[in-house]
Amino acid sequence: MSYMEIRNLKKVYNPYGVHPKVALNGLDFEVEKGDFICIMGASGSGKTTLVNILSTIDEATHGQILLNQKDLLLLSEKEKANLRKEEIGFIFQNYNLIESLTIKNNILFSLRLNNVDKKTQLEKLMPLAKMLNIDEIIDKYPSQCSGGQQQRAAIARALINEPKIIFADEPTGNLDSLNARELMEYFVKINEEKHTTIIMVTHDSFVASYSKKVYYMKDGHLDLFIDRNTKSQDDYYKEIVKVTTQMHL
């Protein structure tokens, strides 16, 4: 049984207007528990729209999204909020940090909402902050930090709850190559050891080579699929580069 099933998923912006825009055009695919999926495609192909809908941030026009056999499109706003709090981690292009809170308090925000004790908060915070190289800036405010530091803080905030599924939209976009590699290695670690399911959008073929599967989107539908299977990361990377080049991405 699949962890997540997407059936005939459609998204149309301005559906009753003069110029409706079809962002997703009848997608069908399945996500297994412990999958690490990368979604690639040209700008405007529907990648971010898909991730936003799967993570309940946006709503579909038509279709089904079954998570553990529960249709996300039929959930109430309260049920969606509880799902996001308990199971889902978000890493998006916009940091969405709270300017009036320190980096530390931004990261710990969800734990405090769940009344996690202070000792446990710190036990979760410090290893994550060190891994992301932000342990020395946790007492600063977002405005005092660089874009890369803010991105890493947003990543820590998403991971600290140990979510069952992570949605990441260009998570390495503001990171240098070293921090990008370390983040991807951490994704692989939690994917393999904790079976955390990851669905990630990226334009970077090297970042994509850390995943298990790559889907290519074009004009709102899934156009091509690559499965790593037993390939080495290097061979997988070369295949991704080849397909990406052929698609002129």
Regions found by a protein language model. Name each.
Residues 55:
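Helix-to-loop junction immediately C-terminal to a conserved catalytic motif
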Residues 141-145, 149-151:
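Conserved ABC ATPase signature
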Residues 3, 12-26:
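A short, flexible loop at the N-terminus of ABC-type nucleotide-binding domains that lies
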Residues 63-71:
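Conserved ABC transporter NBD signature motif
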Residues 166-169:
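Catalytic Walker B motif of ABC-type/P-loop ATPase nucleotide-binding domains
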Residues 101-109:
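Short coil-to-helix segment of the ABC ATPase nucleotide-binding domain corresponding to the Q-loop/switch region
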Residues 160-164:
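A short, proline-enriched helix->beta-strand linker immediately N-terminal to the Walker B motif
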